[in-house]
Amino acid sequence: MRRLIPGSGFRPSNRLRWSSRYGLRRNIHIQAIPSSQLNSVTNESFHSASTTTNSAISPDAKFEVVGSPYSLLSVSLSASQNLYTRRGTLVGLSGKPENVVSTLRILEPFRRAALGIPFLYQKISSTSPVSALVSVKSPVTSFALLQLNGTVDWMLAQRNALLAWTGHSLTIKPRFNKQLSISHWGNSEVTGRGVIALVGKGQIYSITLKEGEQYIAHPSNVVAYTMMQTPPQPYRFKSTTIRFPVPNLGVGKRLFNTNFMSNLSKSDTWMAVMRIFHTFRTWTRRTIWGDRLFLQFQGPTTLLVQSRAARVNDILADHEVNEIADTTPGVTRAAVEATEVSPPEDVAHQTATKENHQRQSIATVHRDGKIDFKSTE
């Protein structure tokens, strides 16, 4: 299955096309995974750093998806190789059961619980080769396999996307939202070498972006993406709502500067009413205008998106919903806010001007003890 965005035709082509309106452009390929043949989700900038296919083989393990699109995950383990799978997802196991050891592992419960990421996993190891079947409880899911060789890191955008993994050097760490950034709340960063199995709702598609290309995606549809220099930024399309300018007479400012309103704003009743108001505003932004919240990705990168979207409250926190809603429509927030520094010549000129510009103050003392200061240049 192959789709082209944008383009008037649906011919599978990767050539540059000329448009009288948009100029030179290249079609972005979206392909479904897994399929009967190997589909690389990397581009020329990553040099085959990782692949997502219907099977992935490492020196000590082999992952293979059985059936499509709603399927089982078959895992073949060599001796002394560890398999981590989400608790309650193991369907069956073949081999010598007396050599198999299963241990319940609690992975960073405090950090993962705070972010809503599952932290109960089952560690399976054996002294002899075994084969295991892994599945999920949801009837509308599909799998995507990622084989990492240590050159490209991945960010898992969905909290429940990670199903199983293997690899001694593979590291999976949850990421906190330190600066209210939408791209690092409830996510998991995957680094190292190994094989991981991701699960998504519906069918999973891969989108490859090259240098200079952009793509807008809904956060509830994004399963994972490769780490890049510029993280995805919140984006809102321009709204067609007609706003009527109302002159500001300053009545509200003068009203809130009164002693009555100042004392009222410090009361518990006022704080309770404001909490209810902000909760209702966040609910309306998430429920009614939730489809206006998007993420903008900059190439080169690779995205994995799912056809069935999760709920917005499963992806974004309350403060993130408000952050995107307050973003100016049609623009994105810069990844790094550069601090404007004046040139050295301008700084020296300003310093010299301040030194040459002297002021003199005259103090007048009255009989009643009152002192008046008058500044002269």
From Swiss-Prot:
Q: Which SUPFAM superfamilies match?
A: TRAP-like (SSF51219)
State where composition is biased (Basic and acidic residues): 346-358
Keyword check for Transit peptide: yes
What InterPro entries does this protein's entry cite?
AIM24, AIM24_sf, Trp_RNA-bd_attenuator-like_dom
> Where is the signal peptide, in residue numbers?
none
Record: transit peptide: 1-35
Family the UniProt entry places it in: Belongs to the AIM24 family.
Indicate what this protein is called per its UniProt record: Altered inheritance of mitochondria protein 24, mitochondrial
Top-level taxonomy: Eukaryota, Fungi, Dikarya, Ascomycota, Pezizomycotina
